[in-house]
Amino acid sequence: MTSTNGPLRVGIGGPVGSGKTALMEQLCKRFRDRYEICAITNDIYTKEDARILTVAGALPEERILGVETGGCPHTAIREDASINLAAVAEMSRRFPKLDLVLIESGGDNLAATFSPELADITLYVIDVAGGEKIPRKGGPGITRSDLLIVNKTDLAPLVGADLSVMESDTQRMRGTRPYVFASLREGTGADAVARFVEEAGGLGR
């Protein structure tokens, strides 16, 4: 359902390699038959993530737009989001009945956040391979995102990470804010993320 303010805009952030593109792919495949959806990816000097989504068949090519941010990727989603706002406007022009735009940030540090002008809902992805201590390091993405995804749980035995410790730290850092433990390459946890986006974003109402 497209609101009078345009499509629901969901920002997906997280460090390099945490699984943002995998989450984009999983959400696109779950939503594409039910909603009018587009995807916008941010890379510093390439459009690699857009290419990955296209090759994976997540959406038709014309519904995926790659943005080259240059410089610091967090600037393009917060301090000066104009390039991404223009991308959202372009997709809305192409598809007037657009319900949902997924916006993947370029990989950045734990302090990166989306401007509320750009994203209605923010999802933040961290991964177990980054170390058991990641949740307790905090940062706006971990503590204030609308939903935190702790990805690559399947790698915990290989990197010596205790998932129960990570969950305890996640609960402590986030308070009542929701989180999901996931293995997005296999699709584990993706349904829970999709449900959250639908419920929090009022899709289908």
Swiss-Prot record:
One of its GO terms (cellular component) is cytoplasm. It is found in: Cytoplasm. GO terms for biological process: urea catabolic process. NCBIfam families: ureG (TIGR00101). Homodimer. UreD, UreF and UreG form a complex that acts as a GTP-hydrolysis-dependent molecular chaperone, activating the urease apoprotein by helping to assemble the nickel containing metallocenter of UreC. The UreE protein probably delivers the nickel. GTP binds at G14, P15, V16, G17, S18, G19, K20, T21. Its main location: cytoplasm. It comes from Methylobacterium radiotolerans (strain ATCC 27329 / DSM 1819 / JCM 2831 / NBRC 15690 / NCIMB 10815 / 0-1). GO terms for molecular function: GTP binding; GTPase activity; nickel cation binding. The gene is ureG1. Belongs to the SIMIBI class G3E GTPase family. UreG subfamily. Keywords: Chaperone, Cytoplasm, GTP-binding, Nickel insertion, Nucleotide-binding. Facilitates the functional incorporation of the urease nickel metallocenter. This process requires GTP hydrolysis, probably effectuated by UreG. Pfam families: cobW. InterPro entries: CobW/HypB/UreG_nucleotide-bd (IPR003495), P-loop_NTPase (IPR027417), UreG (IPR004400). This is Urease accessory protein UreG 1.
